Amino acid sequence: MAIEARQAAEQVMRALNGAGFEAYLVGGCVRDLVLGREPKDYDVTTSARPEQVIPLFEKTVSTGASFGVVTVVLDGVNTEVATYRSDGNYADGRHPDIVFYSDTAEQDVSRRDFTINGLLMSYRGSSSVLSEAAPGSPAQASSFTVSPTPDGAIVVDYVGGLDDIRNKNIRCIGNPTHRFTEDALRMLRACRFAAQLGFGVSMETSLAIDRNAALIRKVSVERITAELLRIVSSPHADLGLALLASTGLLDYLPIRDAVKPSLANAMRRLSTFPTTDQDLGMAMLIAGADPCETDNGHLCKEVLKLSSEHSSAIAGALEVRMGLLVNGPFYHDPESHSRFRLKRLMRTPGAMNGVALARQDVLLRREEEGGGGEAELAKQYRERAARQYLDVFDYCMSLTPGDIRPERLVTGDDLIAMGMEPGRGFRIILDAVEDLQLEGRVATRGEALEAAGKMREAVEASTGSGPNPCGEAVPEKG
């Protein structure tokens, strides 16, 4: 039977303890456990050197040998095991030039970024913490807190992280300027933790971000974008964005020009409609950018360096949002025979997120205009218009892949069988018949063939555009 990630990590710790070494859970997993959250992964820190860790387990991978990191594999579950260490200078603003192994857990946690990430935890059911005789044990440390957990584990705190968690406070370990000089991305991580946890940032840490904000330009765009995606998909994204603005960090980010003018609207949108979908969150962030001045596809792919898939999904969502807001009443009118256009629009990458964005716009506008002092007739008109939009959005959300891309009832072979020569007329007829199908005006192959036959003569006589069975001219589609 497969074991859980925490069980695997605790088996690793027990094995290390049994061999005479100290071993603890460390970092974000301890923070999350203290907060009652489920960690995504579990990291172990130990007094054992990599060459002492490897013989204790059947399967290991040296994932970061130069940093003292070994991955232990138990029943298919990976646990990263890192030797206690202290870091040298960070010449590249990301990695230490040299790593020194340490003898104590206290030295190891003192190099980490924030106090909430500097906690240690023993395995469940353990009856003691560090050996009294071990160098750097709590008994010999100058300042520490030992706190039992309800499930029998013990939290060891050398940095005041437990108090900061209780006070919902993000604070650097040691001198914040030193921490940010080592790795400037830590400034953005502070904003991300504020967004994820709903915490505030200590005055000293906030002022250090303000003083050192320009250092973020040393960080690769890809790393910056990864943090931004985490911020906008967090429960308190508005807090993270507010911190970006108040510390001046936003002024040095590649997305500044697109989002700064409408940041307040983005914060309101993300506060009202929080999401865990990173593509939707990013679309919500840049939804307020001037469409006349912003190429969303270029912004995502070239400025933020997102993948083609994510760029298409985000830019597509914004395109669908605009299409729905501009044409909502038209799509709502059954006499307009426009459902085929709506279904084609819903083929756009990220379309469902586009519907969510448009719905947000309507609901936020309705909330803004819902104050007093409005004539009853105007209020009724506004509410009726909003209801039309919302009906269209509900319809879009109800569409299945088969509704949006039904199997074609007529093919090019059918047109050849009718005596047509392959050419641009094929595309016109095939698309026009599919439009009828999307509109629900043909449902069988026989009806589709009959419609194609009626179009044939008109299309062949035309110079490139023929009659649209839905009532409009059919443009040539390239």
Q: How would you describe each model-predicted region?
A:
Residues 1-478:
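Catalytic cores of the polymerase beta-like nucleotidyltransferase superfamily
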